């Protein structure tokens, strides 16, 4: 079994829409928050800024921590893809410096990015799925731990 991986994600919201990565797999289009794994010697803020520059082509400013989740792959439907993965994700509010442009190092399944209406998230294939409910909630104080969810 591998070690636990720490990942940061950016929650960028503007005018009722959230900025997400647009990805594609055999099941079709799906969405995820921009972000990725922290490397040794890198602060969480540095990691978030690097990942957004790579995946969105823009700089961001880190805001407060909003959500934490565990993802233990063998507990979920994608276990066959990566059966030994355990990741802890820290999801921070983030604010765009310039507008997103073209990603310099998109993820392998990433097609680009999209602004999704938060109200329409229940009809989208977004991961983790709990974001459908969490982002539309009026409650924005404190940090919410989602647990081991997909």
What annotation goes with each model-predicted range?
Residues 1-19, 40, 90-93:
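Conserved N-terminal beta-strand and adjoining loop/helix that marks the start
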Residues 2-4, 80-88, 107-110:
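A generic structural micro-feature
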Residues 15-17, 24, 95-100, 118-120:
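Short loop segments at secondary-structure junctions
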Residues 17-58:
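Conserved Nudix-box catalytic region and its N-terminal flanking loop in Nudix hydrolases
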Residues 59-68:
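A short coil-to-beta-strand element that immediately follows conserved catalytic motifs
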Residues 72-102, 134:
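Active-site-adjacent beta-strand/loop module that shapes the phosphate/pyrophosphate-binding cleft
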Residues 103-135:
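NUDIX/MutT-family hydrolases
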Residues 129-150:
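Charged phosphate-binding loop/patch that engages nucleotide di/tri-phosphates or the phosphate backbone
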């Amino acid at each position: 079994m591998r070690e636990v991986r720490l990942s940061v994600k950016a929650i960028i919201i503007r005018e009722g829409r959230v900025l997400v990565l647009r990805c594609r797999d055999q099941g079709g289009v799906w969405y995820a928050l921009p972000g990725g794994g922290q490397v040794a010697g890198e602060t969480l803020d540095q990691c978030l800024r690097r990942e957004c520059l790579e995946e969105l082509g823009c700089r961001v400013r880190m805001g407060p921590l909003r959500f934490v989740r565990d993802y233990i792959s063998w507990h979920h439907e994608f276990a066959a893809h990566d059966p030994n993965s355990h990741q802890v994700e820290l999801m921070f509010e983030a604010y765009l410096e310039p507008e997103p442009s073209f990603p310099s190092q998109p993820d392998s399944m990433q097609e680009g990015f999209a602004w999704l209406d938060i109200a329409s998230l229940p009809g989208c294939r977004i991961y983790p799925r709990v974001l459908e409910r969490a982002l539309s909630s009026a409650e924005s104080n404190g940090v919410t731990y989602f647990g081991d969810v997909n």
